[in-house]
């Protein structure tokens, strides 16, 4: 685990934006991405999982086996160093507040959807498993930003 990274887990989408708002008050970056880049990436992935056509093909060698999927869903830990899909890598210079609002909108969009329709490296997933996966993914990236403001 990257030194300085915080232990973080979300049980509900309702926990995500209060954490982001706390980070906007002050934080230390311990990974490679800024808070704006993290928010941009997370928003893009949430939207991608809802609207990417189900007919999109993926490399079968990129699949996660059932044991890895089960372990990730049980532990809530997503390994570091997994490559992001094309189009989900954030630009270098972004506005934190703007991208935080984009993440808020993407979370609402995802929650209002009937469920992700995309093929994915960890398929098949139930809707509850998809929600769990997204919460794990959100916490994974947000854990690289450590709040400096007192609660």
Model-predicted regions and their roles:
Residues 24-73, 112-151:
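Short, contiguous alpha-helical
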């Amino acid at each position: 685990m990257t030194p300085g990274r915080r232990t973080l887990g979300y049980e509900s989408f309702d926990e995500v934006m209060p954490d982001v708002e706390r980070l906007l008050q002050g934080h230390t970056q311990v990974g490679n991405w800024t808070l704006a880049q993290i928010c941009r990436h997370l928003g893009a992935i949430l939207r991608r999982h809802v609207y990417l056509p189900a007919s999109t093909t993926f490399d079968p060698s990129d699949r996660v086996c059932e044991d890895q999927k089960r372990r990730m869903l049980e532990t809530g830990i997503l390994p570091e160093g997994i490559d992001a899909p094309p189009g989900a890598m954030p630009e270098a210079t972004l506005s934190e507040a703007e991208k935080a609002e984009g993440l808020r909108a993407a979370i609402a969009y995802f929650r209002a959807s009937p469920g992700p329709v995309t093929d994915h490296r960890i398929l098949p997933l139930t809707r509850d498993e998809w929600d769990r996966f997204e919460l794990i993914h959100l916490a994974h990236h947000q854990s690289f930003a450590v709040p400096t403001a007192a609660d």
